[in-house]
Amino acid sequence: MSDEIDMVLLEAAEKMDKAIEVAREDFATIRTGRANPAMFSKILVDYYGTATPINQLASFQTPEARMILISPYDKGAMSSIEKALRESDLGINPTTDGQIIRVVLPQLTEERRKEYIKVARTKAEDSRISIRNIRRHAKDSLDRLHKDGDAGEDDIRRAEKQLDELTHKHVEHVDEILKHKEAELLEV
């Protein structure tokens, strides 16, 4: 196979790996019954007029399965962090003692678990669509190589087969992550 075909396949693989990484990050923000600092990663705090990710303003500790302690680096940001946590869609009620913010995660109701599973399935489908779009763009590039005469038909067919296998592998990976997240959510 030609170098151009290898480049198309390599680029597609890298983009699909990135799509998997984004899916992992998205799944980490979905709350389960356990305390996980990653669930706060998408929360932005109004820090002196600038929207700043909370993980840049504080450190997180999980002393218990359903409790997170948040220690702001700048105590002046305490009220802004607390406000951002209250306004988030996580359904939490933070308390503060002046030094740290304590977040006790309430037990998830069955209804809330099902809601989160729907969110997880939507995120998984978005990831699958992203991976399929990457495949489509790579296939278009392969077709262009064939049309321009840079690669023979047999090489293109082999490359398309590899691309399909790559796509299938990445979609299965997303399904695996989803299955794991659903099991985590259903755990009482």
Segments the model singles out, each with a brief description of its role:
Residues G33-A35, T96, N133, H137:
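Alpha-helix N-cap and coil->helix boundary residues
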Residues E25, K83-G91, T122-D126, R136:
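Short, intrinsically disordered, mixed-charge
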Residues L69-V103:
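Helix-adjacent hinge/juxtasegments
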Residues P37, Y47-E64, T95-I100, Q107, ...:
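Flexible hinge/switch segments at interdomain interfaces of large molecular machines
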Residues M1-S79:
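A positional/architectural concept
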Residues T32, L90, K147:
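Short, conserved catalytic or interaction motifs in soluble domains
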Residues E64, D74, D89, L105-T109, ...:
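Generic hydrophobic/packing signal
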Residues D3, I101-V188:
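Positively charged, low-complexity, intrinsically disordered RNA-binding extensions
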